[in-house]
A protein has these predicted regions:
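Cytosolic regulatory regions built on CNB/CRP/Popeye-like sensor folds
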Residues: 1-2, 7-10, 60, 66
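Charged, low-complexity intrinsically disordered terminal regions and linker tails
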Residues: 2, 96-100
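A short, charge-rich alpha-helical start-of-domain segment used by transcription regulators
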Residues: 2-3, 10-33
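Conserved RNAP core-binding helix
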Residues: 25, 29, 40-60
Length: 100
């Protein structure tokens, strides 16, 4: 039987580094969704940035009681990082427009 996201997160937090690969696999559709929306980025760079966000969110996560709680925490972290990157890109584009 396949482990749930909550079980994998608990294993990872308990020191099982291999669990990250399984978590990343489960979260891949969301990772690719946000990576694909970063139009000005190379696809692999965007994917790696979102995976790094996933990794950091797992390190910061204090506890994970349920599947929904884990998913919500990770989704929020990835979505916030995506928004930060978009805002940064817009800011950089505005700088370019004003200096030309």
């Amino acid at each position: 039987m396949e482990k749930t996201l909550a079980e994998l997160v608990r294993e990872y937090k308990g020191g099982n580094e291999k669990s990250f690969e399984k978590i990343a696999e489960k979260m891949n559709p969301m990772i690719m969704f946000y990576a694909g929306k970063l139009y000005t980025w190379e696809q692999e760079d965007a994917r790696q940035e979102m995976l790094l966000t996933l990794f950091c969110s797992l390190k910061k996560m204090k506890y994970c009681k349920s599947e929904g709680e884990c998913l919500s925490y990770i989704r929020t972290a990835v979505r916030r990082r995506y928004k930060d990157l978009v805002l940064k890109e817009l800011h950089n584009q505005n700088k370019t427009v004003h200096t030309e």
